[in-house]
Structure formats: structure tokens, C-alpha cells
Amino acid sequence: MTRAMRRHALPCVLIALSCCVAVTAGPRMPAQAAAPVESYRVVNVYPHDPTAFTQGLIYREGFLFESTGIRGQSSLRKVKLETGEVVVQRRAGLETHFAEGLAEWKGQLFQLTWQSKVALVYDLASFAPRGTFAYSGEGWGLTHDERRFILSDGSSRLRFFDSMTFREIGQVEVTDQGRPVTDLNELEYVNGQVWANVWHTDRIARISPETGRVIGWIDLGGLMSGGFKLDSEAVLNVIAYDAPGRRLFVTGKLWPRLFEIEVIPRARE
């Protein structure tokens, strides 16, 4: 190429590049605002079985119903809130399972298993077995929004299942500021939102089930303090909501305490 050709070629290259920029550049999408972080106030403290590897918890009819894990030790329990006393316990049928999340629907309890790919169904009043439902992948957390079951599997997904057949009918990815939120664990449906404990953290994500967007965070740091020596796996793990009483309960694996808390705006620093 001659010097003259190079001189004429350079403006052509610049024009071509400017055209490419003009074509590829478009209107910028507005960035999502950071989800607000809230704090908490302890309202009441109740005793909790420190040997319970708690994986699921719900509040119904004045009692706590608890799913505990560890293969060979898994159980389903009915517990007195005020004393922590286990008044009913079932282990039969769970010998080979690692029990996980727990939900109630129309007088029946649905207990997930971690890797067995089956949900066990019981009568709420008697704990008598009422069947099973199969699902793919792992089971971590479970709740119900009066229309469908909502399941977490440790990823950034919430999966939706039909209430009658337990057939998967959809899913949504959970994001905060456009980034996936992984390790979604135990779930609770609270006033139109899915609240999810994020595994091995002290935070609860408040999630829109329609969009998957994190609406807010609850920071429970320092909740289990007071000199207790806990196992490395003794992490915050479950949420239970008393809808009629508007009370919120949280505890963890192997925790000796269960807390009733009130969510409050975080103090500005």
C-alpha cells in the first residue's frame, strides 16, 4: 500500500468505526437501586433443642412444626413454643433421608429431602403418612403462597410446583442489582413476599416471587451471641411466620435458642 493509499484509508477506517459505535450503542438501562438493608429487635427468646439440626420450621395452631436433618437422625417434630418441648416426633420413614424444608397446605405437612428427590407428606394433626411427591434436583427450602409450592435448591432459582400434583410449573432467578443471589436456603411466605435465608450468612432476602428481584435484606448479625460455643455448621437456618399474630421466629442448626424478632429500619451510620 502506498503512502497516499494509507492517508485515504485512515479516514475510511475511522468512519467505519464510528458507524459501528453508532449501531451498537443504544439507550442505557437504568441500574437497579441497591435493596435496603434492615435490622431487627429481639422481642422474645425461647428454648430450642441444641441437638436439632433444624432445616425447616413453620408455625401453625399454636405450635412449631420442625424438620430436622442429618441422614439417620432426620425427624418431623411438633414443638411447644414457650418451652421448646417436643410433644410429637416422627422418625419412621426418614431413616435413609436427609430431611430439609417444610411447608403446610390444607391440613398436610410437606417435608423435603436433600438428595432423595422426594417430598414426604403427612397429616398435620396425627403425623400419619399421606404419600410422597417426586421432584428433580436437590431440595433445600419449601413454602406455599396459597396458590403453589415454592422450592429452593441451593442455587439462585425459586421453583414453583402445582399444589395438587407437585408438578413443576415454572421458576424465577433471584437477583440483587442484576446479579444472581445463590445459596437460597429455607423459605417462608410473608405478606406477599418470599423470605429466604442465604446459607452460611446472617442475612434474609425479601424477594418478589413474580420478578425474583430482592426487595430488601434483613441483617441478623449478632443474634446468636452471648458466649455460646457453636459448631461451624450451627448457622442461621430457618424462618417461621405466625400470620394471625404477625410474629416472626428465627433459629439455626443446633442453636439452643429460638428468637421472636421484629424487623426495623437500620440505623444510619
Task: Identify the role of each PLM range.
Residues 66-71, 109-116, 151-155, 196-200, ...:
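Conserved beta-strand positions in repeat-built beta-propeller and related beta-rich domains
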Residues 43-75, 91-103, 252-254:
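Beta-strand-rich domains and repeat architectures in extracellular enzymes and scaffolds
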Residues 45-50, 90-95, 131-136, 173-179, ...:
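Surface loop/turn motifs at the tips and blade-to-blade linkers of beta-strand repeat domains
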Residues 61-62, 106-107, 146-147, 191-192, ...:
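Short coil/turn segments that connect the beta-strands within blades of beta-propeller domains
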Residues 54, 184, 231-241:
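Signature of short aromatic-glycine-proline-rich micro-motifs recurring in repeat-based ectodomains
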Residues 84-121, 128-139:
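Blade-loop segments of beta-propeller domains
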Residues 80-84, 123-127, 163-166, 208-212, ...:
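Short loop/turn segments that connect beta-strands within beta-propeller blades
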Residues 33-51, 81-88:
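A short helix->beta-strand "capping" segment at the edge of beta-propeller domains
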